[in-house]
Amino acid sequence: MKNKMKAAAASIIFCIIFVFCFVKCVELLENKSARVQYEAFFESETNFDVIFLGTSHMYNTVLPQELWNEFGITSYNWGYSNCTTAENYYILQEVLKYTEPKLIVLDMYGLLAYENYGNGKYRTDRIEQQHVQFDSIPFSLNTYRASKDVFDDYSGNLDFMFNFIMYHNRWTELGEGDFTVTPSTQKGASFNVGLQQDAEFERLETDEKMEIDTVCYQYFLQILEYCSENEIQLLCVYLPYTASAKEQMVSNSIGEIIEAYDFCDYINLLYSDILNLKTDIYDSGHVNYLGASKVTSWLGDYVLENYNLSGHADEETYSGQWNTEYEEYVQYKMRTISAEKELYNKLLLIYGDEFEADLKILDGCNAEKEDEILSELIAELSDSISVEYVEELSLEDKKYDILLTIKRGNEIFDVVGYEYQNTQTIEYSY
């Protein structure tokens, strides 16, 4: 009898150790992007008043930490690269299990973009991107339905329920980031650093529309019905970027559709005057940090004015956690600024009320006059930058044409010199 009890106990202990080791192996081998992006959502001690959903347009444009700093709004950005409306239909239902937002904001880009990929519900050539969001969500009946529906033509759709199937052979890919995971400080968002020169936007008339009949459009209608039936406030938004003619026609066609649904509204920001095409564009589909900050500020004003929201900056239950995490975000921005080499990128990153810059230009240097982008950036930063012309400039015994000093309060954390060259193109060397 004792031997049987010992054998049973040994079996139980073995099973416990095996399960523990298996779980740890699963955690080690999984792609850590999901934890980096969404761990802060699941571990938050406070509610989120606003949830943002959508594609990379939302992911790169709306910055929750800036919303907190300016308005005291608590929000999380669940947008991600190539996240389709079909995926958002299921992600929305999962997110609502963990927080009780007063408003859902849905990015409208993508109603046409994915129609020529497989079943039209996801990017067949971006499976790894689709995993980032679904890997973060605990298994449920809803995720099972999503894997069988959205990825119905993908032979490995079980990966989206049990991601160990996909990642079990990552042993050779493991790096330092797999052993120490640092969650993003951006509350799901990710701002772009860079500037597209000569960006153009050929605006259509708002009455130029088109019929939308795509797979993702059908899921968009399901989202409208879901929010309307459950009395969830939904704001659909077409975020600003240099859209094509067809994309503009889609943006012009959405409003009439949404009017038929209670609790659902629509704003089209493609034709707003929020962006400066000379300073705010990252590429043909996205804005940079400067553009994102402007759009975020505009949306903050809009939702406070039009929805039942108020700031939490003076509430202890919110301010402790959010102020601490905002400071971590600012420190991340400071590291990003210091690591950046390009003059334009440093300047666009100091937009806002956190940083100040002193820009010294050597007498006789015509950079401000000859470089339209530089002069536009200086104008955009008028509240936080001072420009001074001096007779001599040097840094560490090297002479420069331009010297940029960036500080936060009284702390100078970045100083860099540039030589200005204007031949056929304008260039800055450092």
Predicted regions and their residues:
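Hydrophobic membrane-insertion alpha-helices, especially the h-region
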Residues: 6-26
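Flexible, glycine-rich surface segments
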Residues: 190-257, 261, 266-274
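Membrane-embedded segments
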Residues: 53, 57-142
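Loop/turn elements at helix/coil->beta-strand transitions in domains of secreted/extracellular proteins
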Residues: 47-49, 72-74, 100-103, 228-235, ...
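Alpha-helical transmembrane signal-anchor/signal-peptide segments
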Residues: 27-47
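Secreted/periplasmic serine-hydrolase-like ester/acetyl group-modifying domain
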Residues: 121-229, 312-333
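C-terminal regions of proteins
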Residues: 249-326, 330
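Short acidic-hydrophobic catalytic motif
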Residues: 331-430
